């Protein structure tokens, strides 16, 4: 499986980009939230990816953040929601907006996304509840800036909020960022 691409951005044709990684060009489908944050053509880019093999195609989807990729993974597990629909959802609303809509059970916000009807929106609300890891109110405020930075680093490394928060609780209160990340990673490795 291809988990991450780092290379030169060759083309940007929404929602697809072409990334050159050491002479191999990868066509990657990205949500518009990621597309708008991409650097200019010719610059270095890094995307977290999800590789999907179908009977008639091998497709690569790219994301600017671990929570966005995780939301995509949760979305495509839902019956009736394929990769194209999941990209449409993430393009129409960010991960935080999606998590808030799920947390507050607001089907009306999901229906505004092209291709999402009332029944699909209700199924999304039901099946995503508690699975995005960024539910509103689920994340306790970090005690200080260092802990917030440590949590952000853990999220960027692919851990979810629950794992990150549990690792933070095991750390001394006055730990620095770099030492805290090391200790948190050791705790999560157990």
Swiss-Prot record:
Q: Which UniProt keywords apply?
A: Cytoplasm, DNA damage, DNA recombination, DNA repair, DNA-binding
Q: Which CDD domains match?
A: UBA_RuvA_C
- Give positions of region: Domain I: 1-64
Could you tell me where this protein is found in the cell? Cytoplasm
UniProt region (Flexible linker), positions on chain: 137-141
Cellular component terms (Gene Ontology)? cytoplasm; Holliday junction helicase complex; Holliday junction resolvase complex
Residue numbers spanned by region Domain II: 65-137
- Cite the GO molecular-function annotations of the record: ATP binding; four-way junction DNA binding; four-way junction helicase activity
Among the record's GO biological process terms, what is one?
DNA recombination
Q: Name one Pfam family in it.
A: HHH_5
Indicate the family of this protein: Belongs to the RuvA family.
The protein's job, in short, is:
The RuvA-RuvB-RuvC complex processes Holliday junction (HJ) DNA during genetic recombination and DNA repair, while the RuvA-RuvB complex plays an important role in the rescue of blocked DNA replication forks via replication fork reversal (RFR). RuvA specifically binds to HJ cruciform DNA, conferring on it an open structure. The RuvB hexamer acts as an ATP-dependent pump, pulling dsDNA into and through the RuvAB complex. HJ branch migration allows RuvC to scan DNA until it finds its consensus sequence, where it cleaves and resolves the cruciform DNA.
Per UniProt, subunit arrangement is: Homotetramer. Forms an RuvA(8)-RuvB(12)-Holliday junction (HJ) complex. HJ DNA is sandwiched between 2 RuvA tetramers; dsDNA enters through RuvA and exits via RuvB. An RuvB hexamer assembles on each DNA strand where it exits the tetramer. Each RuvB hexamer is contacted by two RuvA subunits (via domain III) on 2 adjacent RuvB subunits; this complex drives branch migration. In the full resolvosome a probable DNA-RuvA(4)-RuvB(12)-RuvC(2) complex forms which resolves the HJ.
Q: Which NCBIfam families match?
A: ruvA (TIGR00084)
HAMAP family named among the record's database cross-references? DNA_HJ_migration_RuvA
Domain comment (free text): Has three domains with a flexible linker between the domains II and III and assumes an 'L' shape. Domain III is highly mobile and contacts RuvB.
Q: What is this protein called?
A: Holliday junction branch migration complex subunit RuvA
Q: Which organism is it from?
A: Paracidovorax citrulli (strain AAC00-1) (Acidovorax citrulli)
